[in-house]
Amino acid sequence: MSLRIYNTLSRALEEFSPLEPGHVRMYVCGMTIYDLCHIGHARMMMAFDVVQRWLKARGLKVTYVRNITDIDDKIIGRALERGITIGALTDEMIAAMHADIGALGLEPPTLEPRATQYVPRMLALIGQLQAKGLAYRASNGDVNYAVRKFQGYGKLSGKSPDELRAGARVALADGKTDPLDFVLWKSAKPHEPPEAQWDSDYGRGRPGWHIECSAMSCATLGESFDIHGGGADLQFPHHENEIAQSEGVTGKPLARFWLHNGFVRVDNEKMSKSLGNFFTIRDVLAQYDAQTVRFFIVRAHYRSALNYSDAHLDDARQALKRLYTALSLVPPAPVAAIDWTEPHAARFQAAMDEDFGTPEAVAVLFDLAVEVNKSHSPQRAGLLKALGGCLGLLQGDPRAFLQAGAGTPDEADIQARIAARAAAKAQRDFAEADRIRNALLAQGIVLKDGATGTTWEAAQ
């Protein structure tokens, strides 16, 4: 059976085959690292973690690139606000991001380029766009992209420039000749530190956000590649602008397939700090183990909206316990390679081959768990574990998971909560720090603060 993927560009399911037989090249827009990663970032990273895992399960080589934006208005603002260098802030946030990724059990991307490493390539692209008449120097010193000069603008969002302009709110006082035009190179501002500036033919300045991804994707994957992914919020204008930049230079399709994961809402409301419903990955892992968080995310289809709530996480935990309970009954037999002709495996494959249909694939896991409960077959248990592994699930020790659910957190859970408590203390949120300490104490874990950090031990 062939793999079909929903392509945002065509707004249809299309049969997928890589440009280079046997090798998939995929680029996903990563984090702008001025703060800790939140549950929306976790959803995006988890979605493409599953995509990567499934492509590999089908025997394909995957070169997965997820970039890091380490220069941006928000990064500059946060560094100035905290009185530290941009480098100190980004190094801190990258380390925190990697810790969160590790705690979630995500497979790392093949490459993780940082925007500041590719500024010369960005300037080269801007020069090529200017030579083709697609970019112009503005009165304020910026270099902007002339949107109406690119014939294909709007094809990803499905709207013409006139339709898009009707909703544009950009004033022309910023040197743009059209509200839809966007900045490729930002001239240096008096308040910006020297480390946020590079020399160029246009004077000191820095790249715009959109040109960063065009440069990094081309440098790491080539002028055309198989899959470009990201959150639904990036479809317009970020991904639309990437297409205009890259295809404006090369004349070739930037990516054959465009994939966008759905939004995360919190108790059916948009997640925002002002509403008090903003949750970092560390906040979530302070309450729930990583396997529960993964199960909560992957049992929903990646394109659907995901509603975060304690009730839904609690339900995910109970559902996952059913799968681990089956695996605790009998040691799973090792599976060297999944036999995709086996009926359960065939159903699982059919589900995943239809636009990474994780809800239907998870349903197969539960059907298989019922069989394990009845038969106590090591072979059935082995298949359950192997299929779960395609989603990054069921690879932990079943008894440890079930015992942790009974009230004793495991090592990874404890360390995640310690990290969340440290972050709360750093932000002087001592009430939250105390809440985490007391929650662990209620589960029989005592935290001890020392000169070298926080350690823990079981309560006597």
Curated annotation (Swiss-Prot):
Q: Which SMART domains match?
A: DALR_2
A single Gene Ontology CC term: cytosol
Motif ('HIGH' region) on chain: 31-41
Q: What does the entry comment about cofactor binding?
A: Binds 1 zinc ion per subunit.
| CDD domains according to UniProt | CysRS_core
Database matches in Pfam families: DALR_2, tRNA-synt_1e
List where in the cell it is found. Cytoplasm
What are this entry's molecular-function GO terms? ATP binding; cysteine-tRNA ligase activity; zinc ion binding
Q: Which InterPro entries match?
A: Cys-tRNA-ligase, Cys-tRNA-synt_Ia_DALR, Cys-tRNA/MSH_ligase, Rossmann-like_a/b/a_fold, tRNA-synt_1_cat_dom, tRNAsynth_Ia_anticodon-bd
GO biological process terms held by the UniProt record: cysteinyl-tRNA aminoacylation
| Residue positions of motif 'KMSKS' region | 270-274
Q: Which UniProt keywords apply?
A: Aminoacyl-tRNA synthetase, ATP-binding, Cytoplasm, Ligase, Metal-binding, Nucleotide-binding, Protein biosynthesis, Zinc
Q: What does the annotation say about its assembly with partners?
A: Monomer.
Q: What PANTHER family does the record point to? A: CYSTEINE--TRNA LIGASE, CYTOPLASMIC (PTHR10890:SF3), CYSTEINYL-TRNA SYNTHETASE (PTHR10890)
The family note in this entry says: Belongs to the class-I aminoacyl-tRNA synthetase family.
Q: What is this protein called?
A: Cysteine--tRNA ligase
Instruction: Please give the organism.
Output: Verminephrobacter eiseniae (strain EF01-2)
